[in-house]
Amino acid sequence: MFGRDSTNRTFPENGLNGPWHGTSHHNDNPVNVKNYAIMNRYHVRLLSDFAKQLRDTPDGDGNLLDHSLTYMGSNMGNSHRHKHENVPVILVGRASGRLETGRYVQYPLGKERTSNLLLSILDKFGIHREFIGDSTGNLEI
């Protein structure tokens, strides 16, 4: 699923009434930064719940979490400044053994393009492309 980062949808489930997009432009105000973090934690908690459902669903010699890959990310590292560096991404699942789990990876500045990660994911699944969008090459994933 792709979601619109510019949505003005509110998420009362997380205890806040402010819109997603407006809150992302926090202007470095500590209260707004805190509220944006609360919104992000809520979404990560939903991802965690989804991963648990995948883990608890048998599939062949393992479970759906073993045999799938779920990508959660943002299109910006600092949404207030519209910066595309240090974009947070979470990969969940082993992709049928193609990925090692339980790691935190930070790529050097300039190498961390989301398109490089997407290119690398395709490569892990045997889909070899020279580039995707503005990619400059594969990453170690």
Regions found by a protein language model. Give the residues of each.
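Ligand-binding pockets and gating/stacking loops
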Residues: M1-I141
